[in-house]
Swiss-Prot record:
Taxonomic classification: Eukaryota, Metazoa, Chordata, Craniata, Vertebrata
Keyword field: Blood coagulation cascade inhibiting toxin, Calcium, Disulfide bond, Hemostasis impairing toxin, Hydrolase, Ion channel impairing toxin, Lipid degradation, Lipid metabolism, Metal-binding, Neurotoxin, Pharmaceutical, Presynaptic neurotoxin, Secreted, Signal, Toxin
SMART domains registered for this protein in UniProt: PA2c (SM00085)
Entry-linked PANTHER family: PHOSPHOLIPASE A2 FAMILY MEMBER (PTHR11716), PHOSPHOLIPASE A2, MEMBRANE ASSOCIATED (PTHR11716:SF9)
Assembly notes: Heterodimer of one of the acidic (CA1, CA2, CA3 or CA4) and one of the basic (CBa1, CBa2, CBb, CBc or CBd) subunits; non-covalently linked. The acidic subunit is non-toxic, without enzymatic activity and comprises 3 peptides that are cross-linked by 5 disulfide bridges. The basic subunit is toxic, has phospholipase A2 activity and is composed of a single chain.
Location(s), subcellular: Secreted
Enzyme Commission code: 3.1.1.4
Family: Belongs to the phospholipase A2 family. Group II subfamily. D49 sub-subfamily.
SUPFAM superfamilies per the UniProt record, alphabetical: Phospholipase A2, PLA2 (SSF48619)
Tissue expression: Expressed by the venom gland.
Protein name listed in UniProt: Phospholipase A2 crotoxin basic subunit CBc
Cofactor note: Binds 1 Ca(2+) ion.
Length: 138
């Protein structure tokens, strides 16, 4: 399933939400979402199960939980207004869904920055088969 996330990002002809999230991640971490986060741990990328492997993976788990609360929104494709300046991500005015999706992404990108010091390259292309057991509750 995670491969679908990469394909989706590569096939989007206009700036869609996933590309916006990638820009936020790069702004905060100075790393591209692909390859540094698309397959990281058990939750970064599309889907997830088991326990988060570390602080970076937990950021992705919390991001998934945030999206889970937005079931009526098109979390993968809605384009939202935002700006990157003076060291901050600022979500702009939009529809309720756009504002909520932007906040989920902003919080996740900032979380990934805070967890940079514990980023483990061994989790960078972590196989789904090693993500076992029940998922934590959001």
């Amino acid at each position: 399933m995670r491969a679908l996330w990469i394909v989706a990002v590569l096939l989007v002809g206009v700036e869609g939400h996933l590309l916006q999230f990638n820009k936020m991640i790069k702004f905060e971490t100075r790393k591209n979402a692909i390859p540094f986060y698309a397959f990281y741990g058990c939750y970064c990328g599309w889907g997830g199960r088991g326990r988060p492997k570390d602080a970076t993976d937990r950021c992705c788990f919390v991001h998934d939980c945030c999206y889970g609360k937005l079931a009526k929104c098109n979390t993968k494709w809605d384009i939202y207004p935002y700006s990157l300046k003076s060291g901050y991500i600022t979500c702009g005015k939009g529809t309720w869904c756009e504002e909520q999706i932007c906040e989920c992404d902003r919080v996740a990108a900032e979380c990934l920055r805070r967890s940079l010091s514990t980023y483990k390259y061994g989790y960078m292309f972590y196989p789904d088969s090693r993500c076992r057991g029940p998922s934590e509750t959001c």
